[in-house]
């Protein structure tokens, strides 16, 4: 099953549209960085794990990459940079609707898609 790394905004947008069950019914595995989940999603969207959202951990090299991205790019948040680094670490596409994160992913040669693909 194809792994896709998501930022928080994609999941929140799909929740607002009432599309989360359909999302997790697709033949993909969805993950977010664990720190992003705990800081941005757990309190109000903790049930996402029950729907099938996975949590990904950055290894040492991935953490270094994430902090490098925070220094290198102005627009993406720290948690966005964790998602970017996790996509690189796992060698899989990144899902985001954030323009700054999309541009950073493109500069890092990481395949990036949006809500509507």
Question: Residue spans of the language-model regions?
Answer:
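Long, charge-dense
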Residues: 113-117
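Active-site-proximal, substrate-binding regions of enzyme catalytic domains
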Residues: 2-92, 99, 110
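Active-site-adjacent loops and short helices of periplasmic peptidoglycan-processing enzymes
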Residues: 102
